[in-house]
Amino acid sequence: AAINKNIRISSSFSSQNTIKYKNQKISLTKYNIKNDPVYIVRNKTLEYLGKKNTLSINIESNIPRGSGLGSSSALCVATAASVASLFNTKLDRKTLFDLAMYGEKKIHGNPSGIDVATSIMGGLVSFRKGYDPKRINLKHNPELIVSISGKRRKTSNMINKFTNLRNEKPYSFRS
């Protein structure tokens, strides 16, 4: 399910590639960082568009990092959409998903894609890896309470734990 938090990204033409993060607690500028997921998504989007421009990307987020609320996927989706928008291009959902997944793979290793799909579609999403995600429309929207414990977690660690458990006890995962 999507939450009412967001990331705003603005892209502009620049003499050098820059990525500037500004959120609740950090203000950071990164120059030419090849392993940064934003840089990776930026490059893949430019490649898809057939462009080779240098860009400045400014990021503002009110999604708490490391809280399990999908901040990395929102970041990757917003980056691809922002870069494409700079060239007056609106990406279809599939292309946006594919471009954002490059960054998610850098961050999480082997993500399912549910966070990217939810960031793109919003609301409640039915997702199964390898199949098209579907938006679930309910007659009445449930109210959810999300509590942040203050403990940061790495999604990639949780993915690895889940994968190991599924490999050790595959019978537990059959429906």
Question: Predicted segment positions?
Answer:
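Short pre-catalytic strand/loop immediately N-terminal to key active-site residues, enriched for Gly-Thr
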Residues: 55, 60-67
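A short, compositionally biased micro-patch
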Residues: 2-4, 12-14, 62
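C-terminal nucleotide
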Residues: 8-47, 51, 87-89, 98-108, ...
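DPxDG-like acidic metal-binding loop motif
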Residues: 3-5, 69-93
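Secondary-structure boundary/capping motif
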Residues: 67-68, 154
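Generic structural signal for well-ordered secondary structure
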Residues: 2, 34-38, 76
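Short, solvent-exposed loop/turn segments at secondary-structure boundaries
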Residues: 30-32, 68-71
